[in-house]
Design a protein with these regions (language model features):
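Short, contiguous clusters of charged residues that form electrostatic/catalytic patches at enzyme active sites
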Residues: 52-59, 63, 80, 128, ...
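Alpha-helix capping/helix-boundary segments
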Residues: 10, 17, 77-79, 99-100, ...
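HTH-adjacent hinge/linker in prokaryotic transcriptional regulators
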Residues: 2-5, 9-75, 83-88, 92, ...
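A generic structural-conservation signal
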Residues: 27-28, 95, 113, 225
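Residues at secondary-structure transition points
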Residues: 48-52, 56, 77, 95, ...
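Conserved phosphate- and dinucleotide-binding cores of soluble alpha/beta proteins
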Residues: 5, 102-233
């Protein structure tokens, strides 16, 4: 109760609600997340070998790096794809993704994991503590994944925690790249980054979904600033 900063009644009410929604199950002395087909699907997706399209996105993202930069790499399977292609060992990386931290460590790249609550299915750190810690950094470049992109080219998030992290990274980075496969376009979600913020982001993808001469093709992938796709630049 002290850790959650909530009253016992609030905690009990939340547990009952989560149990009714099928998210958790009780056992003697506590609760645990209930194994569901959706959870198994997420875990399967995250353990699959990456395909060539996502590898191309990763190569192009890694090619944007420069020595001595402070970089943010967000959680997610697509952002993880850039790490094997990083050639700059003297960069400094902040991340909220545990797989990202492990991959950076194997490359002997200096990395720091943000603190916060552990989000199991994405193996990431999220929450108020994560956001507050993030406020202390200003990045040369940030590389983010997303739950999707809607028809207005706004970045979508699965929950409020991811949404806050995306907004803050965009605002506190000189350059921000969104790494998404073509399957992420034309989606909807409750949480979206406002257009005036999303417009500053450069998409890196495996297919130029929106017809525009602004797309730049490199290393088998495509990139373009969102504001240019919208005709605002």
């Amino acid at each position: 109760v002290e850790l959650l900063k909530s009253s016992p009644a609030t905690v009990r009410r939340d547990i009952v609600r989560l149990e009714e929604e099928g998210e958790v199950e009780r056992y003697w002395g506590g609760i645990r997340r209930k194994e569901t087909p959706e959870n198994r699907r997420r875990n399967t997706l995250q353990s699959q070998e990456p395909d060539e399209a996502h590898a191309a996105i990763g190569r192009l993202a890694a090619s944007r790096l420069h020595d001595n930069e402070l970089i943010f790499i967000g959680s997610g399977t697509t952002t993880l794809e850039m790490i094997p292609y990083i050639q700059n060992s003297n960069i400094h990386v902040i991340t909220n993704g545990i797989p990202q931290l492990e991959a950076l460590h194997r490359k002997k790249i200096q990395a720091l994991l943000l603190c916060g609550f552990f989000k199991e299915y994405s193996r990431s750190m999220v929450g108020k503590e994560t956001v507050e810690m993030l406020r202390g950094y200003h990045f040369d470049q940030a590389f983010l994944g997303a739950n999707g992109i809607n028809d207005n080219l706004c970045l979508l998030s699965a929950d409020e925690y991811e949404d806050e992290i995306k907004k803050l990274c965009i605002l506190q980075s000189k350059s921000t790249y969104l790494m998404v496969g073509k399957e992420k376009f034309h989606r909807t979600a409750y949480y979206s980054v406002p257009g005036e913020i999303s417009g500053e982001v450069t998409i890196i993808t495996d297919y130029p979904e929106y017809q525009s001469p602004q797309w730049i093709e490199e290393n088998g992938a495509y990139m373009c600033k969102i504001s240019r796709l919208l005709g605002n630049d």
